[in-house]
Amino acid sequence: MLNITLPDGSVRQYESPVTVAQIAASIGAGLAKAAVAGKVNGKLVDACDPITEDSSVQIITPKDQEGIEIIRHSCAHLVGHAVKQLYPNAKMVIGPVIEEGFYYDIATEKPFTPEDVAAIEARMKELIAQDYDVVKIMTPRAEAIKIFQERGEEYKLRLIDDMPEVEAMGMYHHQEYVDMCRGPHVPNTRFLKNFKLTKLAGAYWRGDSNNEMLQRIYGTAWATKDELKAYIQRIEEAEKRDHRKLGKQLDLFHLQDEAPGMVFWHPKGWALWQVIEQHMRKELNAAGYKEVKTPQIMDKTFWEKSGHWDNYKDNMFVTSSEKREYAVKPMNCPGHVQIFNNGLRSYRDLPMRLAEFGSCHRNEPSGALHGLMRVRGFVQDDAHIFCTEDQIVSEARAFNELLVRIYKQFGFHDVSVKLSLRPEKRAGSDDVWDKAEQGLREALTACGVEWGELPGEGAFYGPKIEYHVRDALGRSWQCGTLQLDFVLPERLGAEYVTENNDRARPVMLHRAILGSLERFIGILIENHAGSFPLWLAPVQLVIMNITENQADYCREVAAKLQAAGFRAELDLRNEKIGYKIRDNSQYRFPYQIVVGDKEKQENKVAVRRKAEDLGSLDLDDFIAQLQQEITDALVNH
């Protein structure tokens, strides 16, 4: 007899072997119908997989996150089924799950059109309506190869070649269509009703631009119709907030083919940039940082010594001059070590906090570039703290407090924390990594925050804490980082004189709050839908006259506002006031000021905030109100 322990601690006995589906059926008809898969001793399995020894078992349903991901994965297979029925010559490649969805890469003779995607979605719905069972058959390697050879699925054969150690493959049969996967998958297509294909894109085989271009069909799938509907609404809202669209509408920036991944900032966009940079500079000065500037281009030997050449050269731009090879810096850290090394440092100098709005370049694949979110040229709000091991926890705590306060100022109150651990390709010994990872765990504990851990996601030189902000649409963006590095100070010979007059290596904390300023501005645009808070808006007020009679008074109002530190623009065009209000509304300025004869006579201004008419206000009172609004945002949050 088999003893099966359920999540509530109860134990059920069965004849051996038994499947998850059979266990669910023995508990109740409702659970049997809802069972997508199972978790046996912590491992996900198909509902049809046999259990042959005493085990702990959890029935996975669409209410579980794992259940939703299995539904999405099975929807990817369903894309394959529909595509092969409609386009028999297409070659199926891979179809993984991604956040909130899935995709399938497909090799075709000619690119799919939006009409093709609509036809594929319609055929998927027809197949779901057939309510067929998805049948899993563990198939010997040689037989799996034969199946895909007969079907002409060359990419599946290449994938099998990548797995020389695998003796049997999970083959999932959707009627006549067969796909290969580790699984698990849904037992029946009835679980796949709440799906939608969302977009079409190109993708290179294995992500390498030297390889052939494939067609990538993206989709999403959910447990319920309401969840699908809510997701589609979020996507539609995200499209309205797209920073590329708003960047053009608000006249902030543009990009063009002659400078891929580089941004042309327009006056309003650069004003926004300057507000952010100057605010960060003020905060960093108050927190004890010293601002520095390091070279853009340095000799290749310097990058070899730092370890970047071995670990990062594919992402670096290189150039040569006078028979010397140079690289454009992809990050600022080695330059900051040079400043630390330029002079004899004492333990009394620590912690030393060096900050730089450092301009970096990384040779990102052209297909990966995306507006401001993924660029080749960018500026980081970078800083490096050189300290002793005893100072790690206090410096991490101070950084955490600074970061959380700044995020609140920008309107982000929901911050989650992840700890990224050692990657496979790394510098430094395991002992050094053990020490670094434990140091960050202790720092996070001291900050009183909860965190999740991400194995394999650290930088090559050290583990890192990642800070993720949640925006107005509920999306998570990784912005801030804190990385602990024992490796780079060793490689570049950083040292200080201890209290006992010995030499010691400092610990190096790499940290950023905004990350790339370009990307952070993209996130801000989408979070605020282009309607920035007063303190942040590139133009805070526009002042409009009704007739030429008020033009001089408008200039006086603008001068007084500008003298008080506000970014105000004049609109004295000879147009009707209704037109000017509508025209300026597209730029989403926080305030519009209208001046007529009455306001001019009474030394007042008629104020509009977005679509709301606030009436006529005394100018000095209005200025005081604006100042209080900024104080509330930056000091009182």
Curated annotation (Swiss-Prot):
One of its GO terms (molecular function) is metal ion binding. InterPro entries: aa-tRNA-synt_IIb, aa-tRNA-synth_II, aa-tRNA-synth_II/BPL/LPL, Anticodon-bd, Anticodon-bd_dom_sf, Beta-grasp_dom_sf, TGS, TGS-like. The lineage of its organism: Bacteria, Pseudomonadati, Pseudomonadota, Betaproteobacteria, Neisseriales. It catalyses: tRNA(Thr) + L-threonine + ATP = L-threonyl-tRNA(Thr) + AMP + diphosphate + H(+). The gene is thrS. Keywords: Aminoacyl-tRNA synthetase, ATP-binding, Cytoplasm, Ligase, Metal-binding, Nucleotide-binding, Protein biosynthesis, RNA-binding, tRNA-binding, Zinc. It is found in: Cytoplasm. One of its GO terms (cellular component) is cytosol. It is an enzyme of class 6 (ligase). Residues 1-61 form the TGS domain. Belongs to the class-II aminoacyl-tRNA synthetase family. This is Threonine--tRNA ligase.
